[in-house]
Curated annotation (Swiss-Prot):
Involved in telomere capping. Residues 125-141, 436-447 have a biased composition (Acidic residues). Interacts with ribosomes. Keywords: Cytoplasm, Cytoplasmic vesicle, Phosphoprotein. Residues 1-153, 321-341, 416-448 are annotated as: Disordered. Present with 2160 molecules/cell in log phase SD medium. It is found in: Cytoplasm; Cytoplasmic vesicle, COPI-coated vesicle. Residues 77-87, 95-124, 321-336, 421-435 have a biased composition (Basic and acidic residues). Coiled coil: none annotated. This is Maintenance of telomere capping protein 1. GO terms for cellular component: COPI-coated vesicle; cytoplasm; Golgi apparatus; mitochondrion.
Length: 478
């Protein structure tokens, strides 16, 4: 309690010191506040020991001063019309206010002490926050990079120059390549001559022959016209026999020499392929060009045709060899390879001749038909094969076919041995026609050539197969 009283007294004295000096009876009254403060402090420390005159004087001065204040306050309240409290109450209020201020100051001092401890941490936080705010402001201030604008800037500055330089380099390289290719083309054309052409042909020959052990070149000699499947039938029959009975690869090439009876070789009329159909399917009629006479005479004619074709082939082959010798650009190794390859190529000539035996005079009533290759009124195919490479010759005759079949296929009048028989047959046919005129008018027209053409083709194909088999047997020496 003593401490609280002392603090209140000190507060009062401090307040009094802050007031201006008052006049007392025309004299300035100077209250010795410090002395009174010391007296009060001394009284608080030793209340019973210190009761001097200085303390009384100080108290009197204070009371006088308070009275003056009260008077002044009363005068002010009279003017304003407001009642004022007693000076003691005002002093107490002021003391309470001073206490509140002191408590606030104490709290503030404590807060300042705690705040001083927290100041460095708060400063660091504030600095970090300020830095973050500055960075955010910088990010907001810095604009986003526009890719189109950057590309346009690059193109306007250095990109166009780089692209133009690259374009110029590529154009120069393209022109250089073009000039070089043109020069190489000129050099290539200058290097090509007859020797290179012959070398290419020789290499092609090596390729064709090298893939197989032997090549059969079959040359057909005949007078048949509009026979579409002749080459196919011969090639298929030879391939059938050789592939099943001979080891190693053998290739077969078939060509036609045309009409050897004429002076020189004339090109054969173009025939349709096998896909076009069998005999007689073309617009033009099939022509066999039969030889009427003895079989021996027909064989002589077939051999003559064959020999003529061989001579023509030999002359053409000799001219080819002369051209190779004139080139004279083949080394010894190539010549030896050519000679070895030529031994693997075999040239075969096949002559095809249909021979018809003339029909003798006979009675019409006792007629009966005989189908045979040696019987009059029939024909057969005589096939003569000659291998000029291996020196092999064979003769094959087909089965007999009626001559009237040829007449149906060719669309001509039936051929007989004498004019008398022709007249007799005509009169006999006329009688039959008159008797059956009424019946034939209603009947449909029949084409017998459609019946017989397949049998002729099958018989000729069978003869080709027999000829191929005989050739293989002769090659094997059996």
């Amino acid at each position: 309690m003593s401490e609280n009283k002392n603090s209140e007294a000190e507060d009062v004295f401090e307040f009094l010191d802050s007031l201006p000096e008052a006049k007392n009876g025309g004299k300035m009254v100077n209250t010795d506040v410090k002395g009174s403060q010391e007296g009060v402090k001394g009284g608080s420390n030793s209340v019973a020991g210190k009761t001097g005159n200085d303390g009384k004087k100080g108290d009197d001065d204070i009371f006088e001063f308070l009275e003056e204040l009260e008077k002044s306050n009363l005068s002010l309240t009279d003017k304003k019309g407001v009642e004022k409290k007693a000076p003691s109450e005002s002093v107490n209020n002021k003391a309470q206010d001073e206490k509140v201020e002191e408590s606030k100051e104490n709290k503030n001092s404590e807060q300042d002490a705690h705040g001083k401890e927290k100041e460095p941490q708060q400063q660091e936080k504030e600095e970090e926050e300020e830095e973050e705010e500055e960075e955010e402001e910088e990010e907001e201030e810095t604009p986003l990079h526009d890719p189109i604008a950057s590309i346009s800037n690059w193109w306007s500055s250095s990109g166009s120059a780089k692209v133009s330089s690259i374009w110029n380099k590529t154009a120069e390289q393209a022109s250089q390549i073009k000039n070089r290719l043109a020069q190489e083309q000129l050099d290539l054309t200058s290097k090509i001559n007859t020797s290179t052409i012959t070398e290419i042909a020789r290499n092609l020959q090596k390729i064709v022959v090298g893939e197989t052990e032997e090549v059969l070149r079959i040359h057909l000699v005949h007078d048949l016209v509009n026979y579409p499947s002749l080459q196919y039938n011969i090639e298929s029959k030879f391939d059938q026999v050789l592939s099943s009975q001979v080891e190693g690869g053998i290739r077969i090439f078939v060509d036609e020499w045309g009409h050897p009876n004429n002076n020189g070789i004339t090109p054969v009329e173009k025939k349709p392929s096998v896909a076009d159909g069998e005999l007689g399917n073309s617009k033009k009629k099939l022509q066999f060009n039969l030889f009427d006479g003895k079989v021996t005479d027909g064989e002589k004619l077939a051999f003559a045709n064959l020999e003529n074709a061989v001579k023509l082939f030999n002359t053409a082959h000799e001219e080819y060899q002369k051209q190779q010798k004139e080139a004279d650009a083949t080394p010894d190794d190539d010549r030896s390879s050519i000679s070895s390859n030529s031994n693997k190529i075999s040239d075969l000539f096949i002559s095809i001749l249909p021979i018809a035996i003339p029909q003798k005079q006979k009675d019409a009533d006792g007629d009966f038909q005989v189908t045979d290759s040696n019987t009059p009124g029939n024909f057969n195919f005589t096939l003569v094969l000659k291998d000029i490479t291996n020196d092999i010759t064979t003769i094959t005759r087909s089965q007999g076919f009626p001559v009237k079949w040829v007449n149906w296929l060719e669309g001509s009048v039936e051929k007989t041995g004498s004019t008398a028989s022709e007249e007799r047959n005509k009169s006999y046919d006329q009688k039959k026609q008159k008797e059956s005129e009424d019946e034939d008018e209603d009947d449909e027209i029949i084409d017998p050539s459609e019946w017989v053409k397949e049998w002729i083709e099958d018989g000729l194909s069978l003869s080709f197969g027999v000829m191929a088999q005989n050739y293989v047997i002769d090659r094997m020496g059996l």
